[in-house]
Amino acid sequence: MERPPLDIVALRLCHCRAATAASEGALHIAVQLYRACLEAAERREDAQAIHFFAQKLSDCYEKMGLRDKASSFEALAKA
């Protein structure tokens, strides 16, 4: 897997692809893309983006029925 995008434009494009995948029911792809976004947000040290992408991951895992993973990302989103 390639490194998460650092520049804001690449991050936004990755987020848009993740949102599209989630809305189309391709949750495994959405999770992969949202994880890349979360890693980029962590590397940028952007707390607001970290919380946002952690919540998106929590939502995806909840829809997938993976409550334990959803809970861990929900905790990160609220930290």
Where are these regions (language model features)?
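Structural signature of alpha-solenoid helical repeat scaffolds
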Residues: P5-L6, E45
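Amphipathic alpha-helical segments of tetratricopeptide repeats
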Residues: L38-A40, K78-A79
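TPR/TPR-like (Sel1-like) alpha-helical repeat modules
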Residues: Q55-A79
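Residue register of alpha-helical TPR repeats
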Residues: R12-L13, F52, S72
